[in-house]
Amino acid sequence: MNIFADFSDRIINAVKALELKPKEGGELDLSRVAVEPPRDPSHGDIATNAAMVLSKAVGENPRALGERLAAALAEDPDVAEASVAGPGFVNLRLGNGFWHARLGEMLLLAGDYGRSKMGNGHKVNVEYVSANPTGPMHVGHCRGAVVGDALSNLLAFAGYDVTREYYINDAGAQIDVLGRSVLMRYREALGEDIGQIPEGLYPGDYLKPVGKALADEYGTKLLERPAEEALKIAKDTAIDAMMAMIREDLAALNVHHDVFFSERSLHAGNGGTIRSAINDLTLKGHVYKGKLPPPKGQVLEDWEDREQTLFRSTDVGDDIDRPLIKSDGTFTYFAADVAYMKDKYSRGFEHLIYVLGADHGGYVKRLEALARAISEGKLHLTVLLCQLVKLFRNGEPVRMSKRAGEFVTLRDVIDEVGRDAVRFMMLYRKSDAPLDFDFAKVTEQSKDNPVFYVQYASARCHSVFRQASEQLNVRKFDREAMKAALHRLDDPGEIALIRKLAEYPRLIESAAQALEPHRLAFYLYELANQFHVQWNRGSETDRLRFVKVNDPELTHARLGLVQAVCDVVRSGLALVGADAPEEMR
């Protein structure tokens, strides 16, 4: 249960019970009433601005109205204290019984605690990674992969019908370059001295196995084929090999996709799919023949000093109109984007989310304009831009390139620090802020390493249960027995920990609404910190120990609290895409 949504209903009902009468010409706008945690926890558990936002409409002093509202809310059996602070904020402190009941619900729901129906099954498409199939994934791809995957997990947990998609850029000039690069490696595999790879081709050694595979399959016969046919074979083989490599990299990072969509499929049949999409835009009045003015102070993709077929994107929010068909009759890159978005819309998605690198910032307005044009304003589109990741080791910058044609790959990073560290740390900053990734920091066992600190909380929870099992000679602890004893929890630290656990459903919904999966990582660190603090208090003060052999009922109550922490940490880490270990190794 989202306790803040619950108390929002209670506060609105209390406001209605006051029978406030708006002044002539005024109205009570209850949508402005906010219910949230107080900025200062010492002020209570729930805070509302209701008196402040409604006072003007009813012509009453906000503090006086706050006093009336506080008096009404004090009648609620779950409210231990209702007070007014500042100009009219109403703060509520909830009784221990309320928190015991919430903890009981957590134990009942277990791994489903925090799951929401907020999304109501709305269809969302999240496109992320979509790295060109021209080589292995490098660390620059990593952040978008983690953000997109964790966001998809979060949205699904919040009740949305999520499709995770990868757009394979397997058409265009970079694929021709890939094919020519592989043909060089093919000749090398046949024993030819190819010398230095020419500038403009891909020089990486990762293409050598592809060249060898062609040599093994075709021998010298590929040299006898027409150049265009040989290039097509090389391109097809290379794309398959690169995508297999990329899929392996994604699997190593625990990143998943439901759909891999090929750009080449849009160009099949003489580009019939693209032509159909452009025709649809034409019928809606969004396409015309014309000549764009020369760009001022910038390089404009696909600009020609000739008449082209153009998308009238300035009518739907873009800065400039966009070329669709060049003067020679060939499609622009953007033309394929038109067909691809139309395909997504035809699949019934209500919200399209693109997770892109910061260098794609120029795409935002054109994609938003395209969504408006295709759907006539019905399609919701969001672009999340991920800023750069900088690598460090003990505070010293790490070179992103290892040697000519080679770079620090995603697999290099995973092999050194582990998948969980990579995933958690990629979410430990908001995606639009630059991220510093220090190999030494993410492997140290200290509070300063967030992923260790959170996973250590999971391991400690399990160690408490192992200790309790040994000392009480109980093989397995029953959740109902733990739930029945929760009334014994009265230490302020215990109540504070329950309060933190009770924030989880609200955190899920707010993070999903804001499309900000980094909030999960922040919350997990805060929860882990409170748990470690309570564990340390027990190690220093005997009466606060989780396991009290001479008081089985209190032990069951405290184990219920530990179980809830364990459940939420496991749930949150699963959404992040990391494991919740039972032991630290």
From Swiss-Prot:
EC number: 6.1.1.19
Chief subcellular location: cytoplasm
Key words, A-Z: Aminoacyl-tRNA synthetase, ATP-binding, Cytoplasm, Ligase, Nucleotide-binding, Protein biosynthesis
Enzyme class: ligase
Top-rank taxon: Bacteria
Signal peptide segment: none
UniProt short sequence motif 'HIGH' region, positions renumbered to this chain: 131-141
Cited HAMAP family: Arg_tRNA_synth
Subcellular localization: Cytoplasm
GO cellular component: cytoplasm
Catalysed reactions, semicolon-separated: tRNA(Arg) + L-arginine + ATP = L-arginyl-tRNA(Arg) + AMP + diphosphate
PROSITE patterns named among the record's database cross-references: AA_TRNA_LIGASE_I
Protein's name in the database: Arginine--tRNA ligase
Gene source species: Chelativorans sp. (strain BNC1)
A single GO molecular function term of this UniProt record: ATP binding
Pfam family, one: tRNA-synt_1d
Biological process according to GO: arginyl-tRNA aminoacylation
